[in-house]
């Protein structure tokens, strides 16, 4: 009798079980459970990559807000003042500037305050 797909099937099983090799219990040993868990893990990895972008933006905004409040302003007024001043720095750069170069960041806050006062 001819054996169909034996090499391909074995390779496919081996690939799934290799990916599942740190999972708890039967999820790392039984093919059906391992396949289900690997699929679920790939879904979580995909959504995690998307969610990471939102989390970083939230972190940057929190850092900017904390630094701006030390200067007597809040985040939304600061961003509004920068927009009125035609200063286009993204939130990542503003966050880094607030941490690494507080003097330059203070100058930006002063520019934003002047733009709001007008």
UniProtKB/Swiss-Prot annotation:
Task: Name the UniProt key words of this record, in alphabetical order.
Answer: Ribonucleoprotein, Ribosomal protein, RNA-binding, rRNA-binding
Q: What biological-process terms (Gene Ontology) are attached?
A: ribosomal large subunit assembly; translation
Could you give one GO CC term from the UniProt record?
ribosome
Which NCBIfam families does this UniProt record tie to the protein? rplT_bact
The family note in this entry says: Belongs to the bacterial ribosomal protein bL20 family.
Organism the protein comes from: Elusimicrobium minutum (strain Pei191)
Give each disulfide bond as a residue pair.
none
- What's the protein called, per UniProt? Large ribosomal subunit protein bL20
The record's listing under PANTHER family reads:
39S RIBOSOMAL PROTEIN L20 (PTHR10986)
**Role of this protein:** Binds directly to 23S ribosomal RNA and is necessary for the in vitro assembly process of the 50S ribosomal subunit. It is not involved in the protein synthesizing functions of that subunit.
Single GO term (MF): structural constituent of ribosome
**Origin superkingdom:** Bacteria
